[in-house]
């Protein structure tokens, strides 16, 4: 399963009742009901699913506001290319 598919699955588990499969990758997730509590739950699920640690300064909808943002963050952490904030 690719990163985006896994993120969409995790959104389904943590982001509330919404059709996450059909949300465009660049759409603001807040528009679709994502809130800060869902965001923290999602980040915890991502850390467990991908075996990564999201830096505290990257927690929040500013950095994981779209599916594309989330996938990019995961890739950067996995590749060791996450730039300091």
Stretches with model-predicted labels:
Residues 1-44, 48-85:
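Phosphopantetheine-dependent thiolation modules in NRPS/PKS and related acyl-activating systems
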